[in-house]
Amino acid sequence: MASSSCLWLLALAFLLGSCASLALGHLDPPAPLPLVIWHGMGDSCCNPLSMGAIKKMVEKKIPGIHVLSLEIGKTLREDVENSFFLNVNSQVTTVCQILAKDPKLQQGYNAMGFSQGGQFLRAVAQRCPSPPMVNLISVGGQHQGVFGLPRCPGESSHICDFIRKTLNAGAYNKAIQERLVQAEYWHDPIREDIYRNHSIFLADINQERGVNESYKKNLMALKKFVMVKFLNDTIVDPVDSEWFGFYRSGQAKETIPLQESTLYTQDRLGLKAMDKAGQLVFLALEGDHLQLSEEWFYAHIIPFLE
């Protein structure tokens, strides 16, 4: 009988101690949300000078975070090549499958896309709501596409020469649309009808041919959609595309901001509602394409990942 009383007292003491710990906040802090990264044109998941460095910066400021830098292909070389020549819709489908199978992402994740990876991850948010994306950070992404020839010096320059010639020959040719990544977000403001009818990727995710309510609902589920624009960008044309702006239809000189576009005024994608609710964040910094300092990154990007 005495033994039972002792056990009861021990159990009571443990319970009271647990309650006291709860009251005093002696709980392990929740694990940080995982981060998914998608690199840009001519880059790879793990280049130590680009995405590898970004991964280390995030891990330095957020200990214990799970960072998945997407590799599209079986090798780093294939990853780079696929950023030019693998159908974007196929890439998005593959990424959705990768995310759905990752047990560490099932409670939600943040996403950060660099250059074209920004609009590709937006497509993931719109098409694949499970697991849920919480914050989307687009660093130099081209959300209204481009109408200028890509400049990429160094090892990929010969590939860009080929792309220039191909886009000039016919960006909306069916075979080119199916096989050339940059053609899939090529947006010709002078021939909007041709773009609208023949773009197999950008025109779809931007609701150009009709309103897919699930796209709208899924994008609006984001907590924050952060867009970073590089004010001295020499690669993206027009630069305003990084904030969802673009050329006024019918010409290629004057640009209009997102808020004056049909996409916004008709709220075809939910961006107007998101803007009014404070879900859209527009950040700008001096510098060329993807040129940002550690200090700027820590001050302006890390808060959305913590």
Swiss-Prot record:
Subunit structure: Interacts with CLN5, ATP5F1A and ATP5F1B.
Transport in keyword set: no
Role played: Has thioesterase activity against fatty acid thioesters with 14 -18 carbons, including palmitoyl-CoA, S-palmitoyl-N-acetylcysteamine, and palmitoylated proteins. In contrast to PPT2, PPT1 can hydrolyze palmitoylated proteins and palmitoylcysteine.
Phenotypic consequence of residue 72 to F: In clone BOVPTT-25
Species for this entry: Bos taurus
Active site positions: 115, 233, 289
InterPro entries: AB_hydrolase_fold, Palm_thioest
GO biological process: brain development; endocytosis; lipid catabolic process; lysosomal lumen acidification; membrane raft organization; negative regulation of apoptotic process; negative regulation of cell growth; negative regulation of neuron apoptotic process
Glycosylation sites: 197, 212, 232
Signal peptide start-end: 1-27
SS bond partners: 45-46, 96-128, 152-160
Annotated GO CC locations: axon; cytosol; extracellular region; Golgi apparatus; lysosome; membrane raft; nucleus; synaptic vesicle
Example GO molecular function: palmitoyl-(protein) hydrolase activity
Official protein name in the record: Palmitoyl-protein thioesterase 1
A matching Pfam family: Palm_thioest
